[in-house]
From Swiss-Prot:
Family membership: Belongs to the ATPase alpha/beta chains family.
Protein name per UniProt: ATP synthase subunit beta, chloroplastic
Protein source organism: Chloranthus spicatus
Subunit description: F-type ATPases have 2 components, CF(1) - the catalytic core - and CF(0) - the membrane proton channel. CF(1) has five subunits: alpha(3), beta(3), gamma(1), delta(1), epsilon(1). CF(0) has four main subunits: a(1), b(1), b'(1) and c(9-12).
InterPro entries attached to this UniProt entry: AAA+_ATPase, ATP-synt_VA_C, ATP_synth_F1_bsu, ATPase_a/bsu_AS, ATPase_alpha/beta_chains, ATPase_F1/V1/A1_a/bsu_N, ATPase_F1/V1/A1_a/bsu_N_sf, ATPase_F1/V1/A1_a/bsu_nucl-bd
Record SMART domains: AAA
Function of the protein: Produces ATP from ADP in the presence of a proton gradient across the membrane. The catalytic sites are hosted primarily by the beta subunits.
Gene that produces this protein: atpB
Keywords, comma-separated and alphabetical: ATP synthesis, ATP-binding, CF(1), Chloroplast, Hydrogen ion transport, Ion transport, Membrane, Nucleotide-binding, Plastid, Thylakoid, Translocase, Transport
Chain sites annotated for binding ATP: 172-179
Top EC group: translocase
């Protein structure tokens, strides 16, 4: 760890003692800076421009060196707006990459790309900082054992299980429950794994960032009374920020997550919303730096940039970073270079369905579209694999029969198909689950369902033992015992009504 060179504090050498350069050219967020001969900064060094603009306003802009141009000049990308900068202004080489605060003091706080708190709750109470550019863990440090990361969410654990230290793509439009699913995962990892979460908002709407913060406070994921008890750190570089900030904010969030993994030896959840915006920002910066564009106008370094981020997200012998990344697919074209490059790194996909959300089945995870490389008998065991396959087969058959049901009705189906439809409808409802973070909206207490309980429940439905129970008994319950208890209550209620 090193002291953050871009922030002043006791024991920090003042920036004035550092090497000075001068701005030679400004083109939007890109600065060319001239330095004295023999005193050139390294690639990725942080440069700071301090001074006053023409109306006397204080300027403090941090940039990152991207290219060494020759003739003692470097080209840097600004992390904030370059309004008010002028040629000839002094630029200070900090001598190190951007460094951000890490550790427990970051929990419950909101940061920008530079690691500065932006939540008006005062400075961060930590002296420990870490540079955002690091190499991925060496191969001998990796934990190569394939193990499932239990989330306590039935549909995820059974049909598209997450890998511990893996990368998951989260696909879904607006209003289908992405935010609530993310908050439930943050809550469950804290309770079941004693882990923490880091949320990186990359190039999305500022309103969404604000909504997420408010909902986290409401649901208790961020504890306002005792901020240290919070379970998540938030890092934002939203749509209104320059491309440099959007390109680097993912690394800022990842650096905070790496500290929890490597030093605190915890299981960490890293959320990136949206990974496409990371690629988009890299494309903008690449064009500004004058690089020749590649396919569809993307940067020629697309695979390298994506790899340098994704390779750092992994399990080591100390702890793990499991990453859930929202993926925007431009024009629904899965062959676009940005999503195609992302898919190469994913271990599982969780697809949220508007149709299920419209039926009121939450979480609205599509059991047929969601996939996972972990769903193999040698990894999850024969029992889990067989149960998952039978659930998918039953759901698929029900999907095929829906057109016939819509035209001719249930009565025209064969006895076997009627039984399949009945069980599939029970399965569909049993895949729903009350969430802890949604208690304040639904009034139903949240449920964490272990994997063994989940498998047992679906086996009982598939075996036909519960064919006599009504469908609504399976809706928004935890384990199968709650469904049978709910069925008895429904029976008592119907008798009382008579």
């Amino acid at each position: 760890m090193r002291i953050n060179p871009t922030t002043s504090g006791p024991g920090v050498s003042t920036l004035e003692e550092k090497i000075l350069g001068r701005i030679a050219q400004i083109i939007g967020p890109v600065l060319d800076v001239a330095f004295p001969p023999g005193k050139m900064p390294n690639i990725y060094n942080a440069l700071v421009v301090k001074g006053r603009d023409t109306v006397g306003q204080q300027i403090n802009v941090t940039c990152e060196v991207q290219q060494l141009l020759g003739n003692n000049r470097v080209r840097a990308v600004a992390m904030s707006a370059t309004d008010g900068l002028m040629r000839g202004m002094e630029v200070i080489d900090t001598g190190a990459p951007l460094s951000v605060p890490v550790g427990g003091a970051t929990l419950g706080r909101i940061f920008n790309v530079l690691g500065e708190p932006v939540d008006n709750l005062g400075p961060v109470d930590t002296r420990t900082t870490s540079p955002i550019h690091r190499s991925a863990p060496a191969f001998i440090q990796l934990d190569t054992k394939l193990s499932i990361f239990e989330t306590g969410i039935k549909v995820v654990d059974l049909l598209a299980p997450y890998r511990r230290g893996g990368k998951i793509g989260l696909f879904g439009g607006a209003g289908v429950g992405k935010t609530v699913l993310i908050m439930e995962l943050i809550n469950n990892i804290a309770k079941a794994h004693g882990g923490v979460s880091v949320f990186g908002g990359v190039g999305e709407r500022t309103r969404e960032g604000n909504d997420l913060y408010m909902e986290m406070k409401e649901s208790g994921v961020i504890n306002e009374e005792n901020i240290a008890e919070s379970k998540v750190a938030l890092v934002y570089g939203q749509m209104n920020e320059p491309p440099g900030a959007r390109m680097r904010v993912g690394l800022t969030a990842l650096t905070m997550a790496e500290y929890f993994r490597d030093v605190n030896e915890q299981d960490v959840l890293l959320f990136i919303d949206n990974i496409f915006r990371f690629v988009q920002a890299g494309s903008e910066v690449s064009a500004l730096l004058g690089r020749m564009p590649s396919a569809v106008g993307y940067q020629p370094t697309l695979s390298t940039e994506m790899g340098s981020l994704q390779e750092r997200i992994t399990s080591t012998k100390e702890g793990s970073i499991t990453s859930i990344q929202a993926v925007y697919v431009p024009a629904d074209d899965l062959t676009d270079p940005a999503p195609a490059t992302t898919f190469a790194h994913l271990d599982a996909t969780t697809v949220l369905s508007r149709g299920l959300a419209a039926k009121g089945i939450y979480p609205a995870v599509d059991p047929l579209d969601s996939t996972s490389t972990m769903l193999q008998p040698r990894i999850v065991g024969e029992e889990h694999y067989e149960t998952a396959q039978r659930v998918k087969q039953t759901s698929q058959r029900y999907k095929e029969l829906q057109d016939i049901i819509a035209i001719l009705g249930l009565d025209e189906l064969s006895e076997e198909d009627r039984l399949t439809v009945s069980r599939a409808r029970k399965i569909e409802r049993f895949l729903s689950q009350p969430f802890f973070v949604a208690e304040v909206f639904t009034g139903s207490p949240g449920k964490y369902v272990g994997l063994a309980e989940t498998i047992r429940g679906f086996q009982l439905i598939l075996s036909g033992e519960l064919d006599g129970l009504p469908e609504q008994a399976f809706y928004l319950v935890g384990n199968i015992d709650e469904a049978t208890a709910k069925a008895m209550n429904l029976e008592v209620e119907s008798k009382l009504k008579k």
